[in-house]
Amino acid sequence: MTLSVRIITPDKIVWDDEAEEIILPSTTGQLGILSGHAPLLTALNIGVVRVRPGKDWQTIAVMGGFAEVENNEVKILVNGAEAGAKIDKDTAQQEWNEAQKRLDEASKSGDRQKQIQAEQAWKRARARFQASGGFVQV
């Protein structure tokens, strides 16, 4: 038995297909979903959704949102999403490195708003790099 998975942003459907398994970046940690999972509603962090439609895993960078699981259907509503296969790994790594520098600078500045904005940009860049197949040491 498989899961019906839909990943939806405000302007497009990023994924609409069957999957054997899905791993979500919930606000309480990584959450694995298989068919027959109990009904669930969870908030999602900025991170990487991992979907296994067959033998291989697909990655999708998501920019926070919510996921609902019910009757082998997984509906994921996110602010933004990008398939890992469409992200250039070198560009994503460069963006992540630049975001890390901006975060370090913002941390030293003492400006709380600047720190929060830099941290959000860093999380988005990290998610894109991880989804592209890059390894990020935390």
Curated annotation (Swiss-Prot):
Question: Where are the stretches annotated Disordered?
Answer: 89-117
Provide the coiled-coil residue spans: none
Mark out the compositionally biased spans (Basic and acidic residues): 89-114
Whether Disulfide bond counts among this entry's keywords is no
Q: Show the Pfam families listed in the entry.
A: ATP-synt_DE, ATP-synt_DE_N
Record-stated family: Belongs to the ATPase epsilon chain family.
The subunit structure is: F-type ATPases have 2 components, CF(1) - the catalytic core - and CF(0) - the membrane proton channel. CF(1) has five subunits: alpha(3), beta(3), gamma(1), delta(1), epsilon(1). CF(0) has three main subunits: a, b and c.
Q: What is this protein called?
A: ATP synthase epsilon chain
Q: Tell me which species this is from.
A: Gloeothece citriformis (strain PCC 7424) (Cyanothece sp. (strain PCC 7424))
